[in-house]
Amino acid sequence: MDDTSQRDNIYAAPHDNVGEFIFDKKVVDVFPDMIKRSVPGYSTIIHMIGQMAERYAKADSTCYDLGCSLGAATLAMRHRISAAGVSIVGVDNSSDMIERAKQVIDADSYDVPVTLRCEDINQTPISNASVVVLNFTLQFIPKQQRQSLLANIYAGMNQGGILILSEKLTFEDAHHDELVTDLHHYFKKTNGYSELEIAQKRTAIENVLVPETLTTHKNRLTEVGFRSVDLWFQCFNFASIVAFK
């Protein structure tokens, strides 16, 4: 956790009405703790995003972190990119997230230029991109908008550029889906979340975060035009794909 982060207890007490999950200041204040205790493998994914950016960011190009939240992937890229003339654009539609992310970026001493924008990533112009990151972001975009978003990203990428897509997955095999869901819930329990917290968070987020199968993601990326689509990380029902233009 960073110095401004608190422990996530948003759903620790019973809620008479569990509303939809939103990325407001209440979530921003506990977000690093929430992610660490809720998403298995998150720190590994962030570290490897930095490493892949170091490998594939080209001189005088732009890297995008779409749905950047507090800038974890942005910082991972910033700390590893060595190519000259590279800049990073971080985008999030939560003003609370962007406000806090600016504080995080301003406190960082690395010199790769970073621009943060508060806007809908469906409206973000993509150009001259060598690396684009969607780190647990697409799952919050309405299904009917996902194809057009990826098509817009693809169109703005340079040949040889990469898209890193991390997502929570669902599985066609009911037994496997039940198994990994149970293992994920146990992961959260071992990290200190109560059954009440897990149940209320699930209620809040079930119509906000809409997961899809790995096959669906791969097919969509191929349909958009990516020439190579590969799974590079998976832990339970959390995975990350790298797609090459």
From Swiss-Prot:
EC number of the protein: 2.1.3.-
Q: Which reaction does it catalyse?
A: prephenate + S-adenosyl-L-methionine = carboxy-S-adenosyl-L-methionine + 3-phenylpyruvate + H2O
Cross-referenced Pfam families:
Methyltransf_25 (PF13649)
Any Gene Ontology biological process: tRNA wobble uridine modification
Q: Which residues cross the membrane?
A: none
Q: Which domain of life is it from?
A: Bacteria
Which of UniProt's keywords are assigned here?
S-adenosyl-L-methionine, Transferase
Q: Record-annotated residues binding S-adenosyl-L-methionine?
A: Y42, G67, C68, S69, D92, N93, D120, I121, N135, R202
UniProt GO MF annotations: carboxyl- or carbamoyltransferase activity; S-adenosyl-L-methionine binding
Q: Which residues form a coiled coil?
A: none
Family listed: Belongs to the class I-like SAM-binding methyltransferase superfamily. Cx-SAM synthase family.
According to its UniProt entry, the function of this protein is described as: Catalyzes the conversion of S-adenosyl-L-methionine (SAM) to carboxy-S-adenosyl-L-methionine (Cx-SAM).
| Entries under HAMAP family matching the protein | Cx_SAM_synthase (MF_01589)
Assembly notes: Homodimer.
What the entry lists under PANTHER family is as follows:
CARBOXY-S-ADENOSYL-L-METHIONINE SYNTHASE, TRANS-ACONITATE 2-METHYLTRANSFERASE-RELATED
| Protein name in the entry | Carboxy-S-adenosyl-L-methionine synthase
